Regions:
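Active-site residues of response regulator receiver
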Residues: 55-56, 85
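The feature encodes the CheY-like receiver
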Residues: 59, 89
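Acidic, metal-coordinating helix/loop segments flanking the phosphotransfer/catalytic sites
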Residues: 31-51
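Two-component/phosphorelay signaling modules centered on CheY-like receiver
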Residues: 11-30
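Conserved acidic carboxylate
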Residues: 8
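C-terminal output helix
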Residues: 109-118
Length: 123
């Protein structure tokens, strides 16, 4: 089954995304709280993972570092990555996209907008 990793240390934010995405037919979500856990899951189940949605501020490494590591690995270079942040820095979206994010959402965001963008990227 196609799987989306949600890398988010806030249970509330993760649950909101899960509810929005779990209604997509043929798609399941896995929530992980850190980039390290996400990389482990990708190396273990990489063939099933079709996208990553990550928060910017996470334990140990941030979402931009996770994107850097994914883009440096030939297996995950083209994996869609959506970045979510609570920061209001107007340059952050530009930096995220320049570093390889496929989309950027600022909190508060619309879960439906995240879902639409994910569906667009997976077509």
């Amino acid at each position: 089954m196609r799987t989306v990793l949600i890398v988010e240390d806030s249970e509330t934010c993760a649950e909101t995304l899960q509810i929005a995405l779990d209604s997509i037919p043929g798609l399941k979500t896995i929530v992980l709280a850190s980039p390290g856990a996400a990389l482990t899951a990708l190396h273990k189940h990489g063939d099933d993972i079709v996208a990553v949605i990550t928060d910017l501020h996470l334990p140990l490494h941030d979402g931009l570092e996770l994107i850097r590591q994914l883009r440096a690995d030939t297996r995950f270079r083209n994996l869609p990555v959506l970045l979510i942040s609570g920061d209001s820095d107007p340059q952050l979206a530009h930096r995220a996209l320049a570093r390889g994010a496929d989309a950027f959402f600022s909190k508060p965001y619309s879960p439906a907008a995240v879902r639409r963008k994910l569906e667009q990227l997976l077509c």
